[in-house]
């Protein structure tokens, strides 16, 4: 994306294609609040100040299986470094749909672990209190397992928190979260260490 007008145009295009706010946020790697602002601004209704957010475009990595492979190796190295400190092992790598899946499947292969897939609730436009995402039954089980959570970007940390809570409710042990970009700048979420290739910290 070149500028704010490109982001607005892409957000409107995605909405016209049937994506809901959470899915648009995931696709553009921005918060739901930013998507709402982009869509409101496209209608030129009211001048509302822009939320403080950063759009991350990692498509130059995502379009190449070779680049994804090398990035997954770097994330594996960081995950193993974290696990060594606690003498923990990894049983299952949990990919957060949709953007965490390619990296998670490659990491599971590299780490010799099972692969599980988590469908977040962010794909729903209206999220009811207590509503949760789900672990797909078509992939590995997480029950009683040591888990590594993999996603592309942490924006507010809400999806990561959702996955951690869901895994714990299922008797799993989330050991580390691995992401390409951490926009929240947190060392941990719910006492689970965060490993990111890039950490963004706002200074304003």
From Swiss-Prot:
Gene3D superfamilies: 3.40.50.2020. Keywords: DNA-binding, Transcription, Transcription regulation. One of its GO terms (molecular function) is DNA binding. One of its GO terms (biological process) is pyrimidine nucleobase biosynthetic process. NCBIfam families: PRK02277.1 (NF002620). Belongs to the purine/pyrimidine phosphoribosyltransferase family. GfcR subfamily. Contains an N-terminal DNA-binding winged helix-turn-helix domain and a C-terminal regulatory domain (or effector binding domain) resembling phosphoribosyltransferase (PRT) domain. This is Transcriptional regulator GfcR 1. It comes from Methanosarcina acetivorans (strain ATCC 35395 / DSM 2834 / JCM 12185 / C2A).
């Amino acid at each position: 994306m070149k500028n704010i007008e490109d982001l607005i145009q892409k957000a409107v295009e995605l909405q016209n294609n049937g994506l809901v706010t959470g899915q648009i946020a995931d696709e553009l790697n921005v918060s739901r609040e930013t998507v709402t602002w982009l869509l409101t601004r496209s209608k030129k209704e009211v001048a509302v100040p822009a939320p403080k957010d950063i759009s991350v475009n990692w498509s130059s990595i995502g379009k190449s299986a070779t680049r994804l492979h090398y990035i997954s190796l770097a994330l594996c190295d960081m995950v193993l470094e974290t696990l060594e400190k606690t003498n923990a092992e990894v049983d299952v790598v949990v990919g957060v749909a949709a953007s965490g899946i390619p990296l998670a499947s490659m990491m599971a292969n590299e780490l010799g672990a099972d692969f599980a897939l988590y469908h977040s609730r962010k794909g729903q436009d209206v999220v009811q209190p207590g509503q949760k995402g789900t672990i797909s039954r078509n992939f590995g089980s997480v029950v009683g397992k040591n888990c590594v959570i993999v996603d592309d970007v942490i924006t507010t940390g809400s999806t990561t928190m959702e996955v951690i809570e869901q895994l714990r409710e299922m008797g799993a042990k989330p050991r580390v979260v691995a992401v390409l970009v951490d926009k929240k700048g947190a060392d941990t979420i719910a006492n689970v260490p965060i490993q990111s290739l890039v950490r963004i910290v706002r200074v304003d």
